[in-house]
Amino acid sequence: MNKLSTKLVVAIGIGAALYGILGLWGFSIAPNTFIKPALAILTVFGALFGPVAGLLIGLIGHTVTDTIAGWGIWWGWVISSGIIGFAMGFIQKRVGFSVKNGTYNKGDISYLAITGLIGIVIAIIFAGAFDIIVMGEPFDKIVIQVLGATIADVIVFLVLGLPITIGLAKSNKKHAHLKIEK
């Protein structure tokens, strides 16, 4: 079994705390459904530290949000945050991609966009199905929540998560434009 490094454990702790606390704020768009800028944390930390970190940050962070908010832990949505974080982390496994070193290409950005969008859709559908099957929530309510949450998460991912991740990679890029004068 692979061991988690100290650096990865610390990153997971920081990411989960940020995601958990920032998850308390959002803009309501449907019943119990919000645009939450905290989703960008899953994109950035997933891209920096990989799918396992993204998964754990999503699971732990969402549990923190639900616990602090006091509305009870909604496990379907907790798991969906883990799925989203996991999907965002796939980019970190691509050869040649590194936010830390500023190495990426257009194919990497497309890959992150596609895996992120697929992860969001799968995760939100899972959460909705879980709420209907396990929690006994009404189908009509869940359809509205699933549509609202999917739209909200896609907006946050495309407007905040993706640009912040690209910006971090650009800021870490090693510039080779300098020439040594003789």
UniProtKB/Swiss-Prot annotation:
<feature type="transmembrane region" description="Helical">
    <location>
        <begin position="40"/>
        <end position="60"/>
    </location>
</feature>
<feature type="transmembrane region" description="Helical">
    <location>
        <begin position="142"/>
        <end position="162"/>
    </location>
</feature>
<feature type="transmembrane region" description="Helical">
    <location>
        <begin position="114"/>
        <end position="134"/>
    </location>
</feature>
<keyword id="KW-0472">Membrane</keyword>
<keyword id="KW-1003">Cell membrane</keyword>
<feature type="transmembrane region" description="Helical">
    <location>
        <begin position="9"/>
        <end position="29"/>
    </location>
</feature>
<dbReference type="InterPro" id="IPR022914">
    <property type="entry name" value="UPF0397"/>
</dbReference>
<feature type="transmembrane region" description="Helical">
    <location>
        <begin position="71"/>
        <end position="91"/>
    </location>
</feature>
<dbReference type="GO" id="GO:0005886">
    <property type="term" value="C:plasma membrane"/>
</dbReference>
<keyword id="KW-1133">Transmembrane helix</keyword>
<protein>
    <recommendedName>
        <fullName>UPF0397 protein BCQ_2505</fullName>
    </recommendedName>
</protein>
<keyword id="KW-0812">Transmembrane</keyword>
<dbReference type="InterPro" id="IPR009825">
    <property type="entry name" value="ECF_substrate-spec-like"/>
</dbReference>
<comment type="similarity">
    <text>Belongs to the UPF0397 family.</text>
</comment>
<dbReference type="Pfam" id="PF07155">
    <property type="entry name" value="ECF-ribofla_trS"/>
</dbReference>
